[in-house]
Amino acid sequence: MPQNAAPPRPDKRKPQAAGTGLKSRLAAYEILKLVASGRYLDEAMRKASGLEPRDRAFARMLVTTCLRRGGQIDAVLGVAMSKPPAGRARDAIHVMRMGVAQLLFMDTGAHAAVDSTVSLMRAAGFERMTCLLYTSDAADD
């Protein structure tokens, strides 16, 4: 590679799990969906059993923060949203809760929290909602 050439850019359509914590966040998302459907937390946590101990601990911390601070998180989201997502997009609320939890209640940097939330929205199949978040944010500027 020539000296002045920039390194290749990652494909933005495919979130990179390595180094970004996406695996632990995906596990947390799946766990939150299971808990919301009535499963016990300990039973749902089996979704994270294949993760490295550090990632498993982060997923558990993220899930428990979302559950413990759920009322506060939903109050913040209620200000930002005119109505909750419906249909298949209803599960996107878990991703948004995780993003707010990281921003307000965990020691996650703002850039990392926002980037991981957008990546997780894409990985979970909510590309259209991700675009809507971008456009509504740009309209507010």
Predicted regions and their residues:
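Short, flexible active-site-proximal loops enriched in glycine and acidic residues
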Residues: A86-I93, F105-V114, E127-L132
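Inter-helical turn/loop segments and adjacent helix faces that build the functional surface
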Residues: L120-R128
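N-terminal interaction/assembly modules
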Residues: M1-K83, V100
